[in-house]
UniProtKB/Swiss-Prot annotation:
The lineage of its organism: Eukaryota, Viridiplantae, Streptophyta, Embryophyta, Tracheophyta. GO terms for biological process: protein heterotrimerization; protein import into chloroplast thylakoid membrane; protein localization to chloroplast; thylakoid membrane organization. Mainly expressed in organs that contain green tissues such as leaves, flower buds and stems. This is Inner membrane protein ALBINO3, chloroplastic. The keyword RNA-binding does not apply. The C-terminus (339-462) is required for interaction with cpSRP. Keywords: Chloroplast, Membrane, Plastid, Thylakoid, Transit peptide, Transmembrane, Transmembrane helix.
């Protein structure tokens, strides 16, 4: 007879519930089972261990004499197995949480940003209670979305400041490239001129980093608040098509390296949770990956020949896949937060960058610097390849025209010089003949060779 053994792993702290990563396996005929030693803490803070073995054997079930043969026993046990996994999904317990035997109080993870996470958790519960009071369905799911919107609105001024600083740096890039080309090889001079340019334009290169650093504790606190709520087992309700906000896995399972055990290995050709629940849980990671790619396509910077930028864009292409993989190993409540935050971030960036919501944070005296840099960039790097081809053709035509004009000018100068030289040769010949005719002495005249003109010398040298 077949039996079903359910045993809790050693990382589970004193809870009688089953973790999502608990093993559910079928073995051969016979009884017996496996026991795991489970640590827990008593009231005096001493660590004890206890063993737990859950055995379900068909040998212990009496025969069914009065049942009809049409009853599907396999379907009954399949439903029981699904129920066990549903209970396991609800029992999301953090790896660093300790459950005492008396009060069952959960120790929350906080760290440096514990006060922020406590405040976020309090606001989340208030939002959930308020939505439940007005009979809004899926109260916890909508509470997560509302809390994300509130935090995003609170950090909007910092985001705007960061975008304005980034736009100012982008406007100065043509001038910075001109400095790098002018002082190529002299790194010290490049740094000096660049810092002088920043000072003249009133731009601080570090101004774009400070708002981002300021928002990091807020988002870490929100993440920890959602993790604490999941660890407390409060994400038991579903959200539209999602069976449970605490499923399909837990924070503890992710930290132990078994965050995707709900997907693999397959049991009898189907995933452990069944096809319906598995597909329902996979919708959020797929939506998260799709939203990441849409955001990257909308905010994609203009293409350049910079190899560093090409390598960065290549890395960013695989980033959504990594985020989707992380979404497989956390509760669905955190995936809803990630998806909402990504959609809101994309909307903010489109408004600030594309629709003119943010203006470059620069002094008015920097307008001439920016216009000069843009003019150089437009001349040196035309945006369209066809425009560059037309410029080259026009330049070639102008060069040919200049050569033709220069050639005509040279020919005219040569003709005028040849005419003046021929006139001077005729006058010299007449003077020589007159001198010979007027000579009355018998003294022989010296032989005078034929005199070559300057034009003949010029032709010979050419």
């Amino acid at each position: 007879m077949a039996r079903v053994l359910v045993s809790s792993p050693s990382s589970f702290f004193g809870s009688p519930l089953i973790k999502p990563s608990s093993s559910l396996r079928h073995s051969g005929v016979g009884g017996g089972g496996t026991a795991q030693f489970l640590p827990y803490r008593s009231n005096n803070n001493k660590l004890f261990t206890t063993s737990t073995t859950v055995r379900f054997s068909l040998n212990e079930i009496p025969p069914f004499h009065g049942l009809d043969s049409s009853v599907d026993i396999g379907a009954i046990f399949t439903r029981a197995e699904s129920l066990l996994y549903t209970i396991a999904d609800a029992a999301v317990v953090g790896a660093d949480s300790v459950v005492t035997t008396d009060s069952s109080a959960v120790q929350k993870s906080g760290g440096w940003f514990g006060f922020i996470s406590d405040a976020m958790e309090l606001v989340l519960k208030i939002l959930k209670d308020g939505l439940s009071a007005v009979h809004v369905p899926y109260a916890y799911g909508f509470a997560i979305i509302l809390l994300t919107i509130i935090v995003k609105a609170a950090t909007y001024p910092l985001t705007k400041q960061q975008v304005e600083s980034t736009l100012a740096m982008q406007n100065l890039q043509p001038k910075i490239k001109a400095i790098q080309q002018r002082y190529a090889g002299n790194q010290e001079r490049i740094q000096l001129e660049t810092s002088r340019l920043y000072k003249q334009a009133g731009v601080n290169p570090l101004a774009g980093c400070l708002p981002t650093l300021a928002t990091i504790p807020v988002w870490i606190g929100l993440y920890q608040a959602l993790s604490n709520v999941a660890n407390e087992g409060l994400f038991t309700e579903g959200f539209f098509w999602i069976p449970s906000l605490g499923g399909p896995t837990s924070i503890a399972a992710r930290q132990s390296g078994s965050g995707i055990s709900w997907l693999f290995p397959f049991v009898d050709g189907h995933p452990p949770l069944g096809w319906y629940d598995t597909v329902a849980y996979l919708v959020l990671p797929v939506l998260l990956i799709a939203s990441q790619y849409v955001s990257m396509e909308i905010m994609k910077p203009p293409q350049t020949d910079d190899p560093a930028q090409k390598n960065t864009l290549l890395v960013f292409k695989f980033l959504p896949l990594m985020i989707g993989y992380f979404a497989l190993s956390v509760p669905s409540g955190l995936s809803i937060y990630w998806l909402t935050n990504n959609v809101l971030s994309t909307a903010q960036q489109v408004y600030l960058r594309k629709l003119g919501g943010a203006k470059p944070n620069m002094d008015e005296n920097a307008s001439k610097i920016i216009s000069a840099g843009r003019a150089k960039r437009s001349i040196a790097q035309p945006d369209d390849a066809g425009e560059r081809f037309r410029q080259l053709k026009e330049q070639e035509k102008r060069s040919k025209k200049n050569k033709a004009v220069a050639k005509d000018t040279v020919e005219l100068v040569e003709e005028s010089q040849s005419e003046s030289e021929e006139g001077s040769d005729d006058e010299e010949e007449e003077a020589r003949e007159g001198a010979l005719a007027s000579s009355t002495t018998s003294k022989p005249l010296p032989e005078v060779g034929q005199r070559r003109s300057k034009r003949s010398k010029r032709k010979r040298t050419v």
